[in-house]
Amino acid sequence: NTVSSVRFFSAYVQDQISISAHIDIIVGARYDRFEIKGVDIFDNNRAFARTDEKVSPRFGLILKPRDNISIYSSYSQSFLPRSGDQFLSLTPTTQNLAPEKFTNYEAGAKWDIRPNLNVTAALFQLDRTNATTPSPANPLVIINAGTTRTRGLELALTGKITKAWQISGGYTWQDAYIKGNDAIR
């Protein structure tokens, strides 16, 4: 349906700073710029274009009470350009919608029980703004769904059985819901 050209630029910087033998701080930022231009060949060659750019910060704190245990927390932001992660969803009707923005909070622990056996656990919350969905009134029209929130728990166990064999197991629980836009609740 469309012919598009995409230009993308990204730069990322991060530093993990040891405050003491047991405390590290992580500070980082990422800059992204997406430019997409296209023509909808089934809509009288209707042109569309969009440029999205954002600086996304990342902060973390790692506590290491013992050599084999770390407790961490992190905060990060990211975004998804309106064209989507595959650059295929931008159209003349969606080009004016704001990009999706994500804010993630996470806290967890990692424990190396033995050199060949470790356990991880994490709690997380992911808030997303400017999510989109098909309109209940007309599924061909994309509307802003508002804000979503996903909270969850992740557990993982990884171990080496032999030098050549490793086994991993994990569990994730999530609770997600839409906080905004009464039209789609």
Question: Could you tell me what each predicted segment is?
Answer:
Residues N96, V141-N144:
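Conserved beta-strand positions that form and line the central face of beta-propeller blades
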Residues D40-A47, A137-V141, K179-R185:
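Flexible, solvent-exposed loop segments that connect beta-strands
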Residues A21, Q125-D127, N144-R185:
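Gram-negative outer-membrane beta-barrel transporters
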Residues S83-G84, A131-T132, K179-D182:
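Short, well-ordered secondary-structure micro-motifs
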Residues S4-R128, T150, T172-D175:
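Structural signature of Gram-negative outer-membrane beta-barrels, strongest in the C-terminal barrel
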